[in-house]
């Protein structure tokens, strides 16, 4: 019997043979587990997806983004809760993979090889960050540059609310000008803000040399987030590390 928070090790344990060969891990993989409702205690089956290939199963992309892929709803009391478990998101067309809760070094070692040299391989630690990262890479944006830009936004605009600053897409802002759109997610609320796309392009010209000075190793899994960006800035701009 599993509770909502007990699923990670079980799913990781079954990865061994499946991730050794590219043809195997390219396929979407699901399994059924028994979960005990945290509210009423009733047990019921729940389908988890340890790997989703959005070319083979495009509907899973929307299920991830609207939360239904991770949502457990009790058939008895209708209580809903989020089930956190490892998910490998694979987009073979855009050539990227994003791994939620891929923390085990031995498992990550299995997910390597020359066939991944052209892939962007990213690690994230929450569903929100998984959704954000898929948005960024799907649009062909450099996620390292975007994380640096988010740090710059925080430093330059103290009016940005407290919370997790997440990229939400590209759209039109004031005067129909193209802008990057962000969600600021906190425990209390979610607010949306924009930043001019032209400002982002100018930022890219300035900071691209910094990224070129530290190219990412091919076929290596890396967690590109705010901590990554701040560490990069500290190495190259130590006088601004505060």
Question: Positions of the model-derived regions?
Answer:
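N-terminal cysteine/histidine-rich coordination modules
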Residues: 25-101
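Short, often N-terminal, low-complexity regions
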Residues: 21-22
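Long, contiguous alpha-helical scaffold regions
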Residues: 94-228
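Charge-dense, extended regions
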Residues: 226-242
């Amino acid at each position: 019997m599993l509770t909502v928070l007990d699923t990670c090790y079980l799913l990781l344990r079954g990865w061994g043979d499946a991730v050794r060969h590219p043809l195997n891990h390219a396929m979407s993989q699901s399994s059924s587990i028994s979960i005990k409702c945290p509210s009423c205690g009733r047990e019921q089956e729940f389908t988890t997806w340890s790997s989703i290939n959005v070319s083979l199963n495009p509907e899973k992309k929307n299920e991830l983004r609207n939360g239904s892929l991770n949502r457990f709803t009790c058939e008895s009391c209708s209580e809903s809760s989020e089930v956190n478990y490892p998910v490998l998101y694979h987009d073979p067309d855009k050539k990227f993979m994003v791994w939620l809760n891929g923390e085990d070094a031995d498992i990550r070692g299995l997910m390597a090889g020359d066939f991944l040299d052209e892939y962007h391989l990213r690690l994230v630690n929450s569903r929100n960050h998984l959704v954000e990262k898929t948005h960024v890479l799907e649009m062909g944006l450099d996620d390292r540059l975007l994380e640096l830009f988010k740090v710059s936004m925080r430093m330059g605009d103290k009016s940005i609310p407290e919370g997790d600053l997440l990229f939400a897409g590209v759209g039109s802002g004031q005067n129909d000008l193209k802008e990057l759109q962000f969600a600021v997610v906190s425990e209390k609320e979610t607010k949306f803000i924009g930043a001019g796309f032209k400002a982002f392009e100018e930022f890219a010209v300035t900071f691209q040399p910094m990224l070129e000075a530290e190219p990412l190793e091919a076929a290596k899994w890396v967690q590109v987030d705010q901590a990554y960006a701040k560490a990069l800035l500290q190495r190259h701009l130590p006088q601004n590390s505060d």
